[in-house]
């Protein structure tokens, strides 16, 4: 038929005549319209897999089922060859795995030090003096006080000890605190006091009547003072005094130096005692003297203990020698059934440390 053949498509009633061999580069839309295929576009490429067939070729229509040509469908690529990205670079080579050592790891391993740091580290000088162990000299309490001056070194106290003094109702608080400070040759500092006062006698230095007495009750607001040891007046001589601030029920306050302070109920006074000045030096010297006196006594006691065991060992040895002579044949007998009981008793008396031989009859 002049190089053309008729082809019918499903769903249509008209017949189309197409030239033979025109289906190799036709798109499906062009085949359906019956138009001749235009020249192939540069962006169109034939399908690389020849096994894929158009569904219309596998399903022949009823009028013309022996159509002998195969229609190859190609995939249209919108990207050009220039837009193809290059393949990714190969991954870097993996580092060789370090073989793990067998066994239990060390608890305190040596730090890893590079060769460069070892070479750069300076060598220790053998002539350099070694650092002494312990606290360096000049860091003690006396050295720190010496930096502040001689007056600070001589005025610093030692052996600080806190105290709580309890005064019952009706007792004089000032007299009780003074008697407490006279018990030992130590300075006493009053920190505070709490309680109720029934009456107080204050010293007013500017008035003609130096003693003013007030009747309470009063509440103690503040209570303080100090008693220092008088070096020239004896061990019981003290210098110093007490001061108090009291509050009345109406809110008024009276204060001044204390001459007499009577407690209305239990009053507690917090104080501290310490050694200072020349007493501190004497205290240290006395401690050294006591230690020196104790050391010879301990040496004498040790020498007596060394001589005592030797002298005690001699009577013990003599007693050990006399003990076998007190044994008699009547007190020690042989085993029952043996005919030589008296002979064994004599052997035991001669040598009391001899073991018994159970194999003998």
Curated annotation (Swiss-Prot):
Record GO terms (molecular function): minor groove of adenine-thymine-rich DNA binding
Subcellular location: Nucleus
Chain ranges for the short sequence motif Bipartite nuclear localization signal as given in the UniProt record: 99-107
Pfam families given in the database record: PCC
Low complexity composition-biased segments: 306-322
Xref: Gene3D superfamilies: Hypothetical protein, similar to alpha- acetolactate decarboxylase, domain 2
Chain segments annotated as transmembrane: none
Record feature DNA-binding region, as residue ranges: 99-111, 130-142
Region (Disordered): 29-143, 286-361
Database matches in InterPro entries: AHL (IPR039605), AT_hook_DNA-bd_motif (IPR017956), PPC_dom (IPR005175)
Signal peptide: none
Sequence ranges of Polar residues compositional bias: 48-59
Domain PPC, first and last residues per copy: 154-297
Subunit organization: Homodimer. Interacts with AHL27, AHL29 and ATAF2/NAC081.
PANTHER family found in the cross-reference section: AT-HOOK MOTIF NUCLEAR-LOCALIZED PROTEIN 12-RELATED (PTHR31500:SF64), AT-HOOK MOTIF NUCLEAR-LOCALIZED PROTEIN 9 (PTHR31500)
Job of this protein: Transcription factor that specifically binds AT-rich DNA sequences related to the nuclear matrix attachment regions (MARs).
Protein name in UniProt: AT-hook motif nuclear-localized protein 12
